[in-house]
């Protein structure tokens, strides 16, 4: 066996070795990484490899299976490995800092990788990282009633639990004052049409208000995202002092479980089917629907209780009802009414059913019960 095949075999064995963490990407956790940074000594996935290639001063990459590896580099990989390197570069990651997963957008992965290896923000011998307090800056915000993005000043007052934005740079009166209590932030790059697109949502007069923003700098928008998470953590610690920090972190921000177009009919189920954009918020157990994906407010919402309360989702349409263009139907049953929907494909239908049934089969939290009591009457729009 030549050096090439022998070292390839050693690397593949190292990928599968127990207690190394090598079986998953060191940066996003994707399974079965096929690439490695031989300058850092870690195994990474194809997507994260693309980020590493952009920073040759901190990382150099090779394919585990296709490139040649000499003995010294293989020994370096054996001496390091994912868990050892993560222990060094992720020694002090703040609880609020979002660690991207495999399906997250590129800007989150890029800034995570740069924060770790280029800026070395989380090493044990670095400066103490504290919760960010106030933050002020400019973001490009989409207009409520049009598609134009305009530069707006945003001010985060973490201790007061408030986010404000202003239409005038020197203005004293904010256009909106947003409570951190009801705020969520999620990257929606495809929907917004910008690689740094961030969607901020909050409750206003019983509705969900959507703000769509971006910044030209990837670092700036991710810093804003993590600052909002830090402010949320401060609020939750004060609101729930008896809960450990680890139980609060999952509630800092959340992604939609599923989004996409479906067609729906009205409450009488005789109205024409109309195309609507749906977003499933599993934490608040709400299915929101919009006329367009970038609308400022939802047209309506469905609170999703659980099976014991008479909620269910099933395949197909009620007898005698036919959809418009799309034939793959599903029906959501609530104590108040049925919601009859059609999906663009059977694949989408099954994905929606799986997501909806996952929510309906989970127990309600006290927050969910409060949401149900205050919003159940709003689902018929």
Swiss-Prot record:
Localization in the cell: Cytoplasm; Cell membrane
Gene Ontology biological process: heart development
Keyword Zinc-finger attributed: yes
InterPro entries attached to this UniProt entry: Arf-GAP_dual-PH_domain, ARFGAP/RecO, ArfGAP_dom, ArfGAP_dom_sf, PH-like_dom_sf, PH1_ADAP, PH2_ADAP, PH_domain
Expressing tissues: Highly expressed in placenta, spleen, kidney, skeletal muscle and adrenal gland. Weakly expressed in thyroid, liver, heart, lung, small intestine, peripheral blood leukocytes. Not detected in spinal cord, brain, stomach, trachea, colon, lymph node and bone marrow.
Keyword Cell membrane carried by entry: yes
A single Gene Ontology CC term: cytoplasm
PROSITE patterns, A to Z: ARFGAP (PS50115), PH_DOMAIN (PS50003)
PH domain segment(s): 132-233, 255-361
Keywords, alphabetical: Cell membrane, Cytoplasm, GTPase activation, Membrane, Metal-binding, Repeat, Zinc, Zinc-finger
Zinc finger (C4-type) stretch: 25-48
Gene Ontology molecular function: any one: protein-macromolecule adaptor activity
Occurrences of domain Arf-GAP (ranges): 9-131
Pfam families: ArfGap (PF01412), PH (PF00169)
The protein's role, per its UniProt record: GTPase-activating protein for the ADP ribosylation factor family (Potential). Binds phosphatidylinositol 3,4,5-trisphosphate (PtdInsP3) and inositol 1,3,4,5-tetrakisphosphate (InsP4). Possesses a stoichiometry of two binding sites for InsP4 with identical affinity.
Protein name: Arf-GAP with dual PH domain-containing protein 2
Lineage: Eukaryota, Metazoa, Chordata, Craniata, Vertebrata
């Amino acid at each position: 066996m030549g050096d090439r095949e022998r070292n390839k075999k050693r690397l593949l064995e190292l990928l599968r070795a127990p207690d190394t963490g090598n079986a998953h990407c060191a940066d996003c956790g994707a399974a079965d990484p096929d690439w490695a940074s031989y300058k850092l000594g870690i195994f990474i996935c194809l997507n994260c490899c693309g980020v590493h290639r952009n920073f040759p001063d901190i990382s150099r990459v090779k394919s585990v299976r296709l490139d040649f590896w000499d003995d010294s580099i293989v020994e370096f990989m054996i001496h390091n490995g994912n868990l050892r390197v993560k222990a060094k570069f992720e020694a002090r990651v703040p609880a609020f800092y979002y660690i991207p997963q495999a399906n997250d957008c590129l800007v989150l992965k890029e800034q995570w990788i740069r924060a770790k290896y280029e800026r070395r923000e989380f090493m044990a011998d670095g400066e103490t990282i504290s919760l960010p307090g106030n933050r002020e800056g400019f973001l490009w915000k989409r207009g409520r009633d049009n598609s134009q993005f305009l530069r707006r000043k945003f001010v985060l007052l973490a201790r007061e639990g408030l986010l404000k934005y202003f239409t005038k740079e020197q203005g004293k009166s904010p256009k909106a004052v947003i409570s951190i209590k009801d705020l969520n932030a999620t990257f929606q790059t495809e929907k917004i049409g910008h690689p740094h697109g961030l969607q901020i949502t909050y409750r206003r007069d019983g509705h969900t208000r959507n703000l769509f923003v971006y910044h030209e700098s990837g670092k700036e928008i991710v810093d804003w995202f993590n600052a909002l998470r830090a402010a949320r953590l401060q609020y939750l610690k004060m609101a729930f002092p008896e809960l450990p920090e680890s139980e609060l972190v999952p509630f800092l921000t959340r992604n939609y479980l599923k989004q996409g177009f479906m067609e729906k009919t009205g409450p009488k189920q005789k109205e024409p089917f109309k195309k609507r954009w749906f977003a499933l918020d599993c934490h608040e157990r709400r299915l929101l629907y919009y006329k367009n994906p970038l609308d400022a407010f939802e047209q309506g919402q469905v609170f999703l209780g659980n099976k014991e309360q008479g909620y269910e989702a099933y395949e197909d349409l009620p007898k005698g009802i036919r959809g418009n263009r799309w034939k793959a139907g599903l029906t959501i049953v609530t104590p108040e009414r049925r919601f009859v929907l059609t999906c663009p494909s059977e694949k989408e239908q099954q994905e929606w059913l799986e997501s909806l049934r996952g929510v309906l089969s989970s127990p309600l939290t006290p927050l969910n019960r409060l949401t149900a009591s205050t919003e159940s009457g709003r689902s018929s729009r």
